[in-house]
Amino acid sequence: MAGNLVSWACKLCRSPEGFGPISFYGDFTQCFIDGVILNLSAIFMITFGIRDLVNLCKKKHSGIKYRRNWIIVSRMALVLLEIAFVSLASLNISKEEAENFTIVSQYASTMLSLFVALALHWIEYDRSVVANTVLLFYWLFETFGNFAKLINILIRHTYEGIWYSGQTGFILTLFQVITCASILLLEALPKKPLMPHQHIHQTLTRRKPNPYDSANIFSRITFSWMSGLMKTGYEKYLVEADLYKLPRNFSSEELSQKLEKNWENELKQKSNPSLSWAICRTFGSKMLLAAFFKAIHDVLAFTQPQLLRILIKFVTDYNSERQDDHSSLQGFENNHPQKLPIVRGFLIAFAMFLVGFTQTSVLHQYFLNVFNTGMYIKSALTALIYQKSLVLSNEASGLSSTGDIVNLMSVDVQKLQDLTQWLNLIWSGPFQIIICLYSLYKLLGNSMWVGVIILVIMMPLNSFLMRIQKKLQKSQMKYKDERTRVISEILNNIKSLKLYAWEKPYREKLEEVRNNKELKNLTKLGCYMAVTSFQFNIVPFLVSCCTFAVFVYTEDRALTTDLVFPALTLFNLLSFPLMIIPMVLNSFIEASVSIGRLFTFFTNEELQPDSVQRLPKVKNIGDVAINIGDDATFLWQRKPEYKVALKNINFQAKKGNLTCIVGKVGSGKTALLSCMLGDLFRVKGFATVHGSVAYVSQVPWIMNGTVKENILFGHRYDAEFYEKTIKACALTIDLAILMDGDKTLVGEKGISLSGGQKARLSLARAVYARADTYLLDDPLAAVDEHVARHLIEHVLGPNGLLHTKTKVLATNKVSALSIADSIALLDNGEITQQGTYDEITKDADSPLWKLLNNYGKKNNGKSNEFGDSSESSVRESSIPVEGELEQLQKLNDLDFGNSDAISLRRASDATLGSIDFGDDENIAKREHREQGKVKWNIYLEYAKACNPKSVCVFILFIVISMFLSVMGNVWLKHWSEVNSRYGSNPNAARYLAIYFALGIGSALATLIQTIVLWVFCTIHASKYLHNLMTNSVLRAPMTFFETTPIGRILNRFSNDIYKVDALLGRTFSQFFVNAVKVTFTITVICATTWQFIFIIIPLSVFYIYYQQYYLRTSRELRRLDSITRSPIYSHFQETLGGLATVRGYSQQKRFSHINQCRIDNNMSAFYPSINANRWLAYRLELIGSIIILGAATLSVFRLKQGTLTAGMVGLSLSYALQITQTLNWIVRMTVEVETNIVSVERIKEYADLKSEAPLIVEGHRPPKEWPSQGDIKFNNYSTRYRPELDLVLKHINIHIKPNEKVGIVGRTGAGKSSLTLALFRMIEASEGNIVIDNIAINEIGLYDLRHKLSIIPQDSQVFEGTVRENIDPINQYTDEAIWRALELSHLKEHVLSMSNDGLDAQLTEGGGNLSVGQRQLLCLARAMLVPSKILVLDEATAAVDVETDKVVQETIRTAFKDRTILTIAHRLNTIMDSDRIIVLDNGKVAEFDSPGQLLSDNKSLFYSLCMEAGLVNEN
C-alpha cells in the first residue's frame, strides 16, 4: 500500500529526486515543497480564511475606529505585489515543469489563496481587535515554504552547477520570501485605535485592560504581550496600580459558580459524591488542552536522540569517506555516487535547532494552561470555602476552628493548585518511558529488556515508600492545623496573655507542637524523600549499565559511539520522568490528603434552612412580627444527646413594641436571639420572623475599618439619617475626640475603642440599617448608666428612633425593663414568666417583680420616666416617619472587575479603609513590603539558619555527584571509541566495572546531599526562624496588634513558614544542582569544540541580561502577590469572628462579593507573576536551542577541518541536548528561590519587631512578696497609645493607700481603661511614673510586674483547651485551689455539668461553649487564684445578670478584703461602698474623694453621674 502511494506521488512529481521528503543533500525535495508545504498552506487559507470572512461579515462592527495608517496600506500593497510575483513565477515555468502536477497545482492554489487573504486583510482590520490567526499562520507557512524552496535552488546550484527554474525563478522566489515575511511582520503589529478608548477605559476602571485579551497568536506563544509590564517593572518598582485587569473568564465569582454547580450536581446525583470529579468537570477541558501540548512536546523530545544518531552516523561516514575515497556510501541510493555533502551535516544541525525551538514553544503553552487551571481551582475553591463558612452549623463550626479553615485556604487549596503542574505527568511520565524504551529497543535490541525488568523490580519499593510518605503527610497536615490553631488563639487573646504574663507557657505550648511534633515528623519525611530521591537517581544508571553489560555479552555488534550517545541521551530523557514521578506521586499524596480535608469541610452540616421561617414584613403597629410556638425546642447542635439550648418556648414580639428578655448567666438569653436568627437547630414547634433583621451581638463585632464603614455596613450613605444615628447612639462626643472623626481606623476587633464605644458603634450599625426587626443582645451592658439612659430614650424608648420597629432586647439592665412593652424571664433554657411591665408590678410574688424591687428604681408607671428629659437632641421634630426608615438603600451591584473591585481591595488591604482607590495615609496602614532585590543579608540569614557547615557539605556533595556523573560519560566515550577502533568489545568487564563504580558513587553522593539538605539544613532553619518570629511577636507591644490585622500575622505563621518548611530547601537544592549541571555541560562542550567559547560568551550576556531584566519585575510581582493575599485571610478571619452579625443582617452575598474581589485582586498580581516566568523561560530556552545549534554547527565545521571524532561529537551534543531543560529548571528555581526567600524576608521583618520592655531586669527584681502592701502612687503620670496620638491620661497625681477599695468612673472615653493598662505597662509613660510599694514599675521587668498584679479585664478572653489550662496554664496551683476559685466565682456547678472530666472539661475556641457572662466569671476565677495584693476589676461583671452581680460583688468584698482593689464599673451601685472614687474626665482626675463626700456636693461630676443613673434624686 505504502509503495503504491510513493509510486503515485512520483508520477505526479516527475522529478529525478523523487517525492522525498528529504533529499540526498538533507533538505526538502522540490516536489515535497510544492506538493505538500505550499499546497497545504494554500488549502489552509482557502478553507479557514473563507470561514473567517463569513464570520467577520456577520459580526457587528466592534465600534472601534482604527487609523487608516501605513500598516494597512502596506499590507494590501504587499499582498498585491505577492500576487504579481506568483503570477510571474507561474509564467516563468519551463515546459517540463508545466507537466509537473505538483508545481501547477501549487501555483493555482496559491493564487486563489492570495485573493482570499486580500479580502480577509481588508475586512478583519475594522472588525477584529486581535490580528487574525489564520492570516498569521498562512503567511508563516508561505514564508517557510518559499524559504525552503530558495535553499533547495541554492544547494543544487552549489553542488550541481544548475539553476533549477532558472535565475529568474530564483530571484522571484527570493522576492516572495521577503514579501511574505514583511506581510507576516505587519500583520503581527498591533492596531492603533482612532479614539484612545483604552485610556478612557483605564480612567474609568483604574486598571489597564489585560493585553492578553488583544494579543495575537504569536504574541501569546512567545509571551510578548507581557513585555510592556516587564519594561515597566525594569524601569521602576511595581505597585498595584501598574497591574492589569484579569483576562476575560478569570473572575473568581464566575469560576466559583461553575464549580459550585458541578459540586451540587455531585451531591444530588450520587450517593458517593466526589469533589475531585466536580473539579475535573469544571476545569478538565483546560487540562486536556494542556495534555495535547504535552504529548507534542514529549514526541519532539524523543526526536532529538534520533537526529543525534543521524548526525553521529554522518560524522562517522564522512570521516570514513575521507580516509578511503574509494569506499561506497552505505544507506544512500546508487544514483548519487558523489561524496557526502557537508551541507547535510549543517541541515541536520539546523533540524535539531528547529525541533528544540518548537519544543520550547509547545512546552510553554502547556505550562500556561496548567498554571491557568491552577489559578482557576485556587480562586474557585477559596471563594467556595468562604461561602461554606457562612452557612456552617454550630456543630460544624465547633469541628472546624478558625485556624483549621484558614489552613484549608492557605495550604490545602495551594496543594491542589500545585497538583495541576504535575497532573499531566501521571500519563506523560509512563508515555515518555514507553517511547524511550521503544527507542532503546530499536537502538540496542533485546538487551534493553533488562532495563524494563529493573523498572518493574523497583515498583513495589516505590509503592512502599509512597505509602509511608502519605501517612507522614497526613500527620504533617494534622500537626500544621494544631500549630495554626495555637498561634491563632495566642494572637486572638494576646491582650490577656500579656496582662496575665502568660507568654512563656503559651510559647512553650506552641513550641511543643512545632518542635516535638511537626518538625520531628518533617525530619522523618525528609529522610524518606532522600531514599526516594536516591532510588530514582540510581534507576536510570542501573538501566543503562545493565543494558550495556547485556549488550556487550549477548550482541555480535560493537558498542560504538553511534549507539552509546543516542542511548545515553535516551537514558537522560528516561531519568526525567523517573525523577519527576516521585514528585508527582508526592504531590498526588499531598493533594489527596487536602481533597479529603476539603471534602470533609464541604460536606459539613449547614444551618437548618427552615429553623426559622422568614416572612414579609408586617405593616401595622401591634401586629405579631416574631412568633415562636408549639412548645418550640432548639438544640445548639443537631446531635440529640447534645444539651438542649431552649425548650418549650412560646414567645411573641410585636411591631412597635420593646420586648425584654432577662435571666441569670447561662439561662439562654443569647440562645433565644440565636433561634430567631436561625442559628440553632429546631426539633419541635415553629419560628417565624417578619421583615428584615438587624442584630447586635453581646460581644460587639467591629470590622477592621473606619467608624463610618462600621456604621454604614454596606448601605448607601444618607447624610441626614447618619447624623441622627450618631446622635441617638451617643457617638457625637466620641467622634469629636477621635483624631479623624468617623474616618478613624478602629483596628482589628475595634481594638482601639473602649468597650462602651464598641457597644454603641455596633448599635449604631443596627439603627442605620433601618431594618424591620431588631435583635439586641445586651448592648447596654458595656455602657455607663447615663449613656444607657440616653440610648434607652433616643433609640429604644417610645420616642426613640426605633419606636415603630420590632425590638427584642436581652438585657441585665433593670432600668430598661420599665419601658418594655413585654418582659420574659428565662431560666435554664425555658421561659418561666412573661408579661407586660404593669402585669409584673402587680404580682408581688413573681421573680421578675423581686428583681425590679430589689435592684431597680421603683416606678409605678413608665409614662413619665423619660418625658421630662432635658436632653432631646434627637427627639426634636426630626423623628422620621415609618416610610423614610424603610428606605434601605443598599450599594448598587457594581462591576467589581473594574474600579470598585480595586477600591474594595485597596480598602481591605488598608484595614478596610475608605472605598477609594487613592492612598490616604490617615485612613490606611498598608502592609509594609520591601522593594528591589532581596538583600544578600537575607540569603546569609537563611544560610546561617541552615547552619553554614551543613550548607558547605551539601554543596560539596552536589559537585562530587555531578563530577562522577560526567566522568562516567567521558569513560563511556573512551570505551565506545576503543570498540569502534577494534570493531568488537574488548576488556568489557574492566570498562563496565569502572563505569559502574562511577555511577554508584554519583548516586550515593546524591543520597548524602539530600539527607544533609533535609535533616541538617532545612529543619534547622525552620526551627530557628519560627522560634525567632514567635519570640518577637509575643514580645511585641500592643500597638503592633492594634495596627496589624491578625490575618496578616497568621499569614506569616502559615504561608511563609510553610514555604520555609517545604519549598525553600527543595528549590535551593534544585537550583544548585542545575547550576552545577550547566557549568559541567558548558565545560564539556568547550572541551570538545573550543570555538564554542565564542558563542557561549555573548549567549551568557543575553542570558544574564534577560534574567536580571526579568527578576526586577518578578520580584515585585511576587511581593505584591504576598501582600494582596494577606487581606483575603484577614477578611476571612474577621468574617468568621462575626458570622452571627453577617448572617443576622443577611449580608452573606455582600461579604462573599468582597471576598471574591480580594481574591481577584490577589490573582491580578499572581497571574502576571507566572506569565513573567514563562516570558523569561521562553527566551532562555531559545538560548538553549541556539546552544544546540552552535554545538552541532561547530561540530560539523570542525569535521570539515578533519579534527573531530564521532565520540567527541556524541559527548558534546548529548550534553547540549540536556541544556534547554536544565536552563528551564534554573530559571524556575531562580524564580522559586527569589519568591520563597521573600518569606524569609517577611519572617525576618517580624523577627525584628520593636519589643516591649524586658520581661526581667536583672539587678532590679522586686522581692518575692512584693507588693506586700498594695500602695499605689501616680506621680504626674501621662501616657498615650502611640507616639503620633494625643495623650489619653494627663498629669495624673493620685495616691491609693494599702487595702483601699477605689472605684473609677467617668464618661465613655474619659480614660478609665487606660488607667488600668498603664498600671500593667501595656502602655508606657510619656511623663511621670507609677510607684507600687516604693518600687517604680518602669524600673522592673514586665513579667515581675504583671504576674504580681491581678486583673479581671473588660474583654473576657477564653482559650481553647481545658478549664484547668484556662485558669492555671503554668500548673502552679492544686486542684483544690482551682475548684475553690470556681466555687467563689459561681462557675463550679456549670463546669461539673459540662462533662465528667471535671477540670479537664474542654472549652472551645474563644470560649464558644460559655456565655459572655460565664467567660467573665472564668476571668474572676483566674483572679481568685493569684495571691496579689492589688486587684483591678475592669467592668468585671458587665455581662452578668443583676442577681449574680450582687453575689459576685459580695464575694469580691469578702475574698479580697485585705487587697487594694481598683474597680471600673458601669453599674454605679456596685462601687457605692468603695472607700474612695476617682472621677476621670478627658484623661484627667476631675474628682477623688469618698462617695459620701462627692455626693454631698450636688455640683460634682460624680453627683451628676449618679443622678443620671437614678441612684439619687433631686430631693
Swiss-Prot record:
Keywords: ATP-binding, Cadmium resistance, Membrane, Nucleotide-binding, Phosphoprotein, Repeat, Translocase, Transmembrane, Transmembrane helix, Transport, Vacuole. One of its GO terms (molecular function) is ATP hydrolysis activity. The modification Phosphothreonine is found at residue 911. It is found in: Vacuole membrane. The chain crosses the membrane at residues 33-53, 74-94, 100-120, 131-151, 170-190, 279-299, 346-366, 423-443, 447-467, 531-551, 573-593, 944-964, 1002-1023, 1067-1087, 1089-1109, 1181-1201, 1206-1226. Residues 54-73, 121-130, 191-278, 367-422, 468-530, 594-943, 1024-1066, 1110-1180, 1227-1515 are cytoplasmic. Signal peptide: none annotated. It catalyses: Cd(2+)(in) + ATP + H2O = Cd(2+)(out) + ADP + phosphate + H(+); an S-substituted glutathione(in) + ATP + H2O = an S-substituted glutathione(out) + ADP + phosphate + H(+). Residues 287-590, 951-1235 form the ABC transmembrane type-1 domain. Its EC number is 7.2.2.2, 7.6.2.3. Its main location: membrane. Residues 626-853, 1272-1507 form the ABC transporter domain. GO terms for cellular component: fungal-type vacuole; fungal-type vacuole membrane; membrane; membrane raft. The modification Phosphoserine is found at residues 251, 873, 903, 908, 914. GO terms for biological process: bilirubin transport; cell redox homeostasis; glutathione metabolic process; response to cadmium ion; response to metal ion; transmembrane transport; vacuole fusion, non-autophagic. It is a multi-pass membrane protein. Belongs to the ABC transporter superfamily. ABCC family. Conjugate transporter (TC 3.A.1.208) subfamily. Present with 396 molecules/cell in log phase SD medium. PANTHER family: ATP-BINDING CASSETTE SUB-FAMILY C (PTHR24223), MULTIDRUG-RESISTANCE LIKE PROTEIN 1, ISOFORM I (PTHR24223:SF443). This is Metal resistance protein YCF1.
